[in-house]
């Protein structure tokens, strides 16, 4: 039986960003240095495939520090943690490694700098997301006000409209964030803006790659976890760009094939915590059902790398 023709357009860049790659290496190197088990507070990155692989290697994932014994090392996830977490680890004399993405740490430092200068912070982010919790937890309670939508801006009650600054979660929709920033600047003209955009390069690049696909495709598949903020934003970007079908799938087994009937051009993107092996799995699934042509649509090359913490570098360099 002849397979129907279909073109897969692969978004590039896609998949692992430098912060995710660094965080995964930290867990792997910690296991090599200290042996299993190594405890990780929260999923190191939001991807089940990655977490399951590290669990098989000996990582134990917990949600709170008190679930980890004091005699084993603990790693903080790439999303960042409130200041109270490392303080508690030190109080308990625990060995810990902070895998917070350096670009998230930059936002933390930015918030602290503004706080020291007497400014009240407004954070654009998603309530309950670990990154938002970690960033807001850098300052005393009440010093950071959270907004999620343009509508939230109207309801803000600030101490002094002349003494404000805003920061953002690094994995937001660029377009949605721009609208919220515009609302903030309209209501609070004196608000201090970041020296550099807080939304990270990888989020920006992956959303740009999806937009570049949009005029060629009828459907979009985003490979990523449902709790991955940046992956969910890619689905939203695809829908906003006019994709009739935009699915978020963790594995090829989750693809809704019925929704792809009659489709001849599909875009494939991957969130910043999705490994390339899952992209290969999706391509293989399409080749089983379609006469598949694969085309790469590359918008930018990424060359960003982040070093792992010194405690692990020294272990790796020791002969």
Curated annotation (Swiss-Prot):
Binds 1 [4Fe-4S] cluster per subunit. [4Fe-4S] cluster binds at residues 17, 101, 200. Dimethylallyl diphosphate binds at residues 46, 79, 129, 228-230, 273. Isopentenyl diphosphate binds at residues 46, 79, 129, 228-230, 273. Gene3D superfamilies: 3.40.50.11270, 4-hydroxy-3-methylbut-2-enyl diphosphate reductase, catalytic domain (3.40.1010.20). Keywords: 4Fe-4S, Iron, Iron-sulfur, Isoprene biosynthesis, Metal-binding, Oxidoreductase. Transmembrane segments: none annotated. GO terms for biological process: dimethylallyl diphosphate biosynthetic process; isopentenyl diphosphate biosynthetic process, methylerythritol 4-phosphate pathway; terpenoid biosynthetic process. This is 4-hydroxy-3-methylbut-2-enyl diphosphate reductase. The gene is ispH.
